[in-house]
Amino acid sequence: MKKYVFLFLSGMTFALTQCSDKHGDSAAYNGPVTQSEKQAFGVDTVATGLENPWGMAFLPDGRILVTERKGEIRIIQDGKLLEDKIENVPSVYANGQGGLLDIVVHPDYANNGWIYLSYAKPGEGGGGTTIARTKLQGNAFTDFHELFSAQPFANSDVHFGSRIVFDGKGHIFFSSGERGTKANAQKLSNHLGKVLRLNEDGTVPTDNPFVGIDSAKSEIWSYGHRNPQGLVYDAATETLWDVEHGPKGGDELNKVEKGKNYGWPVITYGINYDGTPITDITAKEGMEQPVHYWVPSIATCGLVRVGSDQYPGWKGNFLVGALALTHVHRVEVSAENKSVHDEKLLDKIGRVRAVVQSPEGFLYVATESPGMVLKIIPQ
């Protein structure tokens, strides 16, 4: 393991020192860092050698479970990536962006033992974003229950969404991308390009906004999304937030509210990858504006709202992973939910796939290229 310590000096400069212990690894993070304006921090390399890590979950015994998109779940224990892997993992549609995606433990895991997974499930017509829950005995899953699959399945290898969060009131929210077909996001007759809400057992809450409406899917909470690859529920304010991976420009941070339309592809701050326009408008009545957006795109993936006293300078801020621009992005939002400041952290760290907060309140980052897990240490 390598440790990097960053000291903030007079608001202008910082010094970097490096030390190695017996777990030193030449693949550990050693790139340049943009120091935060509000919080001094260090970085520990927790594990290297991962292949396309996507999600992270923390068990009460200290183990960290990390999903690899190809369909495996790795175990980090006592600062080491174990050779042993979790058994009885479901088969996945491991094409392009599809595969084994998010993993979260139930807030009451100590009593009920549930672990929730999202993955691209193979099936007729291609693959579809699927949610399941299971229990862990030793290093094997047992008592596996598939809860939901987004319909229709699509012969596409992009835009699965797939983040899962709990609201602490008996519900789960999770994201589903529009699978590369823009029009899906505006159609209430499918689950694609949506944020969805279920009871924890997979049934549909009776107070979902489109329950009882003909031709509308009852699981839908909000719509008009492109590819929400970050999702967080802030229990302190009882608000749901997502980050959406935009096209060429137009990544978004959104406050996600019941029944609302987030505009894709009718309004966007992005353009097609070939430079042609998607639309000529960025606002329309009845469609929500992002709280923050990025032009050019940073390729957002992974989202956490810092709720821990471990990082007093960042408390209440959002940390967002950047795939294309390979950093962690910090966004400050006012009490009125307006973006007031942002900055780049951990520059050139690698393609950031996940940013999560552990039960102890520490922040962890998973990257691909190289595949590793890092811990942000407050100073």
State what each model feature region is.
Residues H23-T181, Y233, T239-G246, P296-S334, ...:
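Acidic, Gly/Ser/Thr-rich repeat motifs that build Ca2+-stabilized beta-propeller blades
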Residues M1-Y4, P378:
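Positively charged n-region of N-terminal signal peptides that target proteins for export
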Residues F174-L192, G250-E252, V256:
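Short, conserved, GDST-rich strand-edge loop motifs in beta-rich repeat architectures
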Residues K85-G98, F144-F160, E200-S222, W264-V295:
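Surface-exposed loop and turn segments in beta-propeller and other repeat-based domains
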Residues T129-N139, L188-D201, V256-E257:
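Beta-propeller blade signature
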Residues A15-Q18:
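C-terminal motif of bacterial Sec signal peptides marking the signal peptidase cleavage site
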Residues Y4-M12:
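Sec-dependent N-terminal signal peptides
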Residues H225, N337-P359:
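Conserved blade-ending motifs and adjacent loop-strand segments that build the rim/top face
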